[in-house]
Structure formats: C-alpha cells, structure tokens
C-alpha cells in the first residue's frame, strides 16, 4: 500500500480513491496535454467508458460540444479564466457542471477538473419548503 505524503494529506491510494468515489458527484481530471487522466466510479450523467482514460478529451465529446469544451480549456490554459459553471437539465433533472482550472503554486496550468452534480435534491428541498 503506497502512501501519499502531501503536506495536507497522509493517506493511501485506496483511501483517496474511496474518498473520491464517496463524493455525490462526478469527478473528472484532464491533464495539461488534454488527456483524460481520472474519473471516479459511479453512475454518470456523461457516460465515460474506461477506455477514455489516456485518450484526448476532445475525442470523447460529440462534435457540437467539442468547440465549447476546447474553448473552456483554452481559456484556462491562457489564464483568462479559472472557472466555468454551467446549469443544465437532462431527463428532467437539474445538473450543475463546474469546470475549474487546476494550477500549481506558481499558477502554472496543470489541467482541468470537471465536477458534475445532480441538483434534484436541492430542487426537491426548496419545493417542499414553499
């Protein structure tokens, strides 16, 4: 079992993997070369076969979405933006998609983190409290 001795983290790979898989959202990381490097387990709004790991992120998107994804990542790479939030509805459910630039301590671009969260629980909560 290999440990990760970061200044704010001392855990094993299996513990980190379990933590990421416990989060109630999809987590995807694309590196600075636009290669899919990670996504957590669980049901997905945006289907991701395990064969997507190690592949170019743009090859995993429908043609009409690719320019949008490319634009977001390019804006992160250039330092124009650090975050893009998108709300969408799919199959009648609201989703919050948050794209974030991942940077090191010197602000060097390392990649893009995508978080996708089903927001139906919030919609239901506020509907009940009316």
Q: Where is each model-derived feature located?
A:
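Sensory/regulatory domains in signal-transduction proteins
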Residues: 42-123
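PAS-family sensory domains
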Residues: 4-74, 128-130
